[in-house]
Amino acid sequence: MSNDLGTRAGFVAVIGAPNAGKSTLVNALVGSKVSIVSHKVQTTRMPVRGVAMRGNTQLVLVDTPGIFSPRRRLDRAMVKSAWSGVADADCVVVIVDATDLVAHPEGMAARDTANILSELKSPATKAALALNKIDTMKRADLLPLIQRLAPPGRFAQVFMISALTGDGLEELAAWCAEQMPPGPLLYPPDQAADIPLRLLASEITREKLYLRLHDELPYAASVESEKWEEKKDGSVRIHQVIYVQRAGQKAIVLGKGGQTIKAIGEAARRELEHLLERRVHLFLFVKVRENWAESREHYRELGLEFPED
């Protein structure tokens, strides 16, 4: 099939161990926030598609959940989803936290990365390694890491980047663009993401929840946008429910006198107003649902396949 427009378009799977910088990288390449970021590992639960243009080439960047050794049902679904994103991609970027791997060569991230490399089935010509966070380390420490992770024949290219500062990102994007097949654009050129607004709103609130509570709340919370009402004045009224597994966790989310949930709501509302470019009325509720992580409906909302035991 001919392509008279001279455009190219395809999928780039961004994979790596938890907290390697996948979401920060995708957000930086897209130029706007499409995936939530926090210091907590396993923040991304579903594949998020960010859309970036480089000349006449469209990159659909799939921010996959971090790949690690799964234990819970939700963990298994996330890891399976990540590998599915790799199988469907036109090229793969394996991103690693170079500072962590140099400082802790036998640590969890190093083990997860080794497992990823052993399972990676993509042709070397379609795979690149991105050493992230180089702005915080000495270049002399990178050579042994490159020799360990990228022996000849494993990757087509190795890029030294900082997803936070932007170092090396244009070179990485240019290589990805070269891998895209000729064809029509998959999305309008001004579209930044492929994610329903209700789900994006839930993800933003979940990010603020994680950022606010740090280590007080484990991965036992989920956010769902139960009501989305467009108002005549152009504003939107959003009702969200934060589901936790125990009453004690509900108390943590609410905070003394409701101050914690108020702060979470204010932070989420400000970001939603910035993204939607209109006034947002956000109402948060906290409910205890012990088995939310076992709900098939929850998996469907996240676009994950429900793994059977």
Language-model-derived ranges and their functions:
Residues 125-128, 135-193:
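Canonical P-loop GTPase G-domain recognition
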Residues 32, 51-55, 85-92, 98-99, ...:
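Conserved, well-folded catalytic cores of nucleic-acid-processing
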Residues 1-91, 96:
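Conserved G1/Walker A P-loop phosphate-binding module
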Residues 13, 27, 46, 50, ...:
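Solvent-exposed alpha-helical segments within well-ordered globular domains of core cellular machineries
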Residues 21, 168, 260:
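Conserved glycine(s) of the Walker
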Residues 197-309:
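P-loop NTP-binding site
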Residues 87-114, 124-142:
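Conserved Switch II/interswitch segment of TRAFAC-class P-loop GTPases
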Residues 44, 67-69, 102, 137-138, ...:
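Catalytic P-loop NTPase motifs of RecA-like helicase/translocase cores
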